[in-house]
UniProtKB/Swiss-Prot annotation:
Residues 235-238 are annotated as: G5 motif. This is Dynamin-1. It comes from Rattus norvegicus (Rat). Brain-specific (peripheral sensory neurons). GDP binds at residues 41, 43-46, 59-60, 206, 208, 211, 236-237, 239. It catalyses: GTP + H2O = GDP + phosphate + H(+). The lineage of its organism: Eukaryota, Metazoa, Chordata, Craniata, Vertebrata.
Length: 864
């Protein structure tokens, strides 16, 4: 084997496996092991029983192995078995081992034919075994049996993949010799996960059950369907032998006799059979462990580092310590206060790049949402002028007024200021909602203490609700203050003279038709959504919105204008998204029931996000295009009945000038009021609600928690947190133990190198019969060495013996035998050796290569 260090490698992995199986982490750790895969009834369990020399595995029809069995063989002077789930109990009767495997399988999978990926760990001590670790996996099947689910094939495949996809897992691919080897389930799955063949070892069973006149010599010599690590043949007990209780020792003797007496296998007898397979697996697993140990150590160290910081908090953890609970309570409250302040005020560390924080959202409410709500509440132009005209006429009464009454201005302004209450209250509600959401996010770190989290959220949320009432009262007070006194001496107010002058200028502008340059309100890309497919479908254009019109161009260079639409008599309405559409849509329509664009009653415009839609709506509001209201039609019918439109058209010039003057005064004063409200609203909310809540959390939250009752109840851990802490501590100690185990082993050993690559393209060829030797059944011609004609049927190879000195490790390609008369008169004619023209001849690696004039026995890929 090499030295003592090498002999200790497999027991080392067994100790690692036990350490991690005890905490349920064995499936996640990539420990070196050998996975036994194969089709149903391929003989996997029989191979394992031959290793142990005892009957201990369940047998029967259908799927017998329904859970992975991690079988750890340990060379010992005494013979007994141990289960990891039955610690301390030694099984000396292997019939009891079989019953325990069946009982443990049924405990997890039930009594039907279901399967489970949870492994059973069995360790067998015996003087007849070599140190070895194997995993017996369920046989691959395609048809459900009994109560099995219809997808049993995929369930088994998924389970196999959990083991064989790991880089540290050797694959023992078991295939029966009496079936088509090219269609072997084991070789197919091995090729899928190990395309280079570095981890696959082939085992051929049922050699004694092949059809008469056929053999598997070419396969066992690794000529047909070659594997990098080669094939080993075994002969298991037949069902008759098992029923007759044939001793495994006698079965191994019969296996030896079979290989020595069979004319096709006698030259390979020393490299066939269960004992040889044990030695090969022991050597290859040992070498594999030695090669993978450094990587395993690095992986364990990285896992240890990743959990070390969290485990430090748990090492000295005492759940029932009152001092610990008090300290934890203070830390939780302090952390909650700091998190709340950072989310509101902002911070330079731990910046969230996925979503806006509470402070950023509140800022957006103050400076985007609230101004937009104010703009939405602005007056309708026609309605306002009508109200002003009614106010002027009602003030004059029966008299004919000579001057513009200021009471009409005051009455109109008060009505408009009163409308500001609704958006102001809505602003407070939106801020309260964001504060409550921020409190919930800050309390997420308290999930290990569910009672504390619940109580803390309740206290802070109750305080926010109390401050909400005070804040709304103050906001209403601000609006009432604006209503109490009209400050017409404000420095920004245009005054009566300026309003009259502006009215005259507007009249002149209407008559002259000369307009100054119109201010652009907004530019941007929009998609016209309701153009039919026959007319080109939806298209994106560059839109320019001014106070007078809406224009759109082919692109943002604004050279090719497509259309210009006047904003007079336009209104906005929302449009539901289409079933397959991801865009957000709104529409423009004409209030006078006219086509708004060509032959379309409405112009549907689409944006990528709802935020863009809201922004465009705010821009249209500035241009005098207002959203559609539910009562628009009723108001229109009332207007027609009252004849107000005709009244406005027939308004005398003096009244029209007075209305325009009051209109300008109202516009100027409302601009001042809106500016004041937009400025004072954020300040009021910040002072009365946000800053007050922050101060409450820092100074009064802890006192409120202490007054709630028993602090021990508050600091009770959640069951999930306690379980996580225990799992982390177990994982930490298991990793420490594993690294300690690895550190005790000396791996400075010399091992057999990996056999050279072989031509493994045969798996792409379908329906190649296994076990039939003929010139057409040789490996595919894509070789890296000269082609070798196969021996004729019935011919005997050279007597077994040591290979010639100087032969390369893994065996050079066999040299063709000398042509001559065939001892079989019914065999094929002799073949003349020739060099194939598909590849250059192989170059000998050593000077001592065997002469082609002498037949040579092929070397195995293993050096024992």
């Amino acid at each position: 084997m090499g030295n003592r260090g090498m002999e200790d490698l497999i027991p080392l992995v067994n100790r690692l496996q036990d350490a991690f199986s005890a905490i349920g982490q064995n499936a996640d750790l990539d420990l070196p092991q050998i996975a036994v895969v194969g089709g149903q009834s391929a003989g996997k369990s029989s191979v394992l029983e031959n290793f142990v020399g005892r009957d201990f595995l369940p047998r029967g029809s259908g799927i017998v192995t329904r859970r992975p069995l991690v079988l750890q063989l340990v060379n010992s002077t005494t013979e007994y078995a141990e289960f990891l789930h039955c610690k301390g109990k030694k099984f000396t009767d292997f019939e009891e081992v079989r019953l325990e495997i069946e009982a443990e399988t049924d405990r997890v999978t039930g009594t039907n034919k279901g399967i489970s990926p949870v492994p059973i760990n069995l360790r067998v001590y015996s003087p007849h075994v070599l140190n070895l670790t194997l995993v017996d996996l369920p046989g691959m099947t395609k048809v459900p049996v009994g109560d099995q689910p219809p997808d049993i094939e995929f369930q088994i495949r998924d389970m196999l993949m959990q083991f064989v996809t790991k880089e540290n897992c050797l694959i023992l691919a078991v295939s029966p010799a009496n079936s088509d080897l090219a269609n072997s389930d084991a070789l197919k799955i091995a090729k899928e996960v190990d395309p280079q063949g570095q981890r696959t070892i082939g085992v051929i069973t049922k050699l004694d059950l092949m059809d008469e006149g056929t053999d598997a010599r070419d396969v066992l010599e690794n000529k047909l369907l070659p594997l990098r690590r080669g094939y080993i043949g075994v002969v298991n007990r037949s069902q008759k032998d098992i029923d007759g209780k044939k001793d495994i020792t006698a079965a191994l003797a019969a296996e030896r006799k079979f290989f020595l007496s069979h004319p096709s296998y006698r030259h390979l007898a020393d490299r066939m059979g269960t004992p040889y397979l044990q030695k090969v697996l022991n050597q290859q697993l040992t070498n594999h462990i030695r090669d993978t140990l450094p990587g395993l150590r690095n992986k364990l160290q990285s896992q240890l580092l990743s959990i070390e910081k969290e485990v430090d908090e748990y090492k000295n953890f005492r759940p029932d310590d009152p001092a610990r609970k008090t300290k934890a309570l203070l830390q939780m409250v302090q952390q909650f206060a700091v998190d709340f302040e950072k989310r509101i005020e902002g911070s330079g560390d731990q910046i969230d790049t996925y979503e806006l924080s509470g402070g950023a959202r509140i800022n957006r409410i103050f400076h985007e949402r609230f101004p937009f709500e104010l703009v939405k509440m602005e007056f309708d132009e026609k309605e306002l002028r009508r109200e002003i005209s009614y106010a002027i006429k009602n003030i004059h009464g029966i008299r004919t007024g000579l001057f513009t009454p200021d009471l009409a201005f005051e009455a109109t302004v008060k009505k408009q200021v009163q409308k500001l209450k609704e958006p102001s209250i809505k602003c407070v509600d939106m801020v309260v909602s964001e504060l409550t959401s921020t409190i919930r996010k800050c309390s997420e770190k308290l999930q290990q203490y569910p009672r504390l989290r619940e109580e803390m959220e309740r206290i802070v949320t109750t305080h926010i609700r109390e401050r909400e009432g005070r804040t709304k009262e103050q906001v209403m007070l601000l609006i009432d203050i604006e209503l109490a006194y009209m400050n017409t001496n404000h420095e920004d107010f245009i005054g009566f003279a300026n309003a009259q002058q502006r009215s005259n200028q507007m009249n002149k502008k209407k008559t002259s038709g000369n307009q100054d340059e119109i201010l652009v309100i907004r530019k941007g890309w929009l998609t016209i959504n309701n153009i039919g497919i026959m007319k080109g479908g939806s298209k994106e254009y560059w839109f320019v919105l001014t106070a007078e019109n809406l224009s759109w161009y082919k692109d943002d260079e604004e050279k090719e204008k497509k259309y210009m639409l006047s904003v007079d008599n336009l209104k906005l309405r929302d449009v539901e998204k289409g079933f397959m559409s991801s865009k957000h849509i709104f529409a423009l329509f004409n209030t006078e029931q006219r086509n708004v664009y060509k032959d379309y009653r409405q112009l549907e415009l689409a944006c990528e996000t709802q935020e863009e839609v809201d922004s465009w709506k705010a821009s249209f509001l500035r241009a005098g295009v207002y959203p559609e209201r539910v009562g628009d039609k009723e108001k229109a019918s009332e207007t027609e009945e009252n004849g107000s439109d005709s009244f406005m058209h027939s308004m005398d010039p003096q009244l029209e000038r007075q209305v325009e003057t009051i209109r300008n005064l109202v516009d100027s004063y409302m601009a001042i009021v809106n500016k004041t409200v937009r400025d004072l609203m954020p300040k009021t909310i910040m002072h009365l609600m946000i800053n007050n809540t922050k101060e409450f959390i820092f100074s009064e939250l802890l006192a409120n928690l202490y007054s709630c009752g028993d602090q021990n109840t508050l600091m009770e851990e959640s069951a999930e947190q306690a379980q996580r802490r225990d799992e982390m501590l177990r994982m930490y100690h298991a990793l420490k133990e594993a690294l300690s185990i690895i550190g005790d082993i000396n791996t400075t050993t010399v091992s057999t190198p990996m056999p050279p690559p072989v031509d493994d393209s045969w798996l792409q060829v379908q329906s190649v019969p296994a076990g039939r030797r003929s010139p057409t059944s040789s490996p595919t011609p894509q070789r890296r060495a000269p082609a070798v004609p196969p021996a004729r049927p019935g011919s005997r190879g050279p007597a077994p013996g040591p290979p010639p000195a100087g032969s390369a490790l893994g065996g050079a390609p066999p040299v063709p035998s000398r042509p001559g008369a065939s001892p079989d008169p019914f065999g094929p004619p002799p073949q003349v050796p020739s060099r194939p023209n598909r590849a250059p001849p192989g170059v000998p690696s050593r000077s001592g290569q065997a002469s082609p004039s002498r037949p040579e026995s092929p070397r195995p890929p293993f050096d024992l």
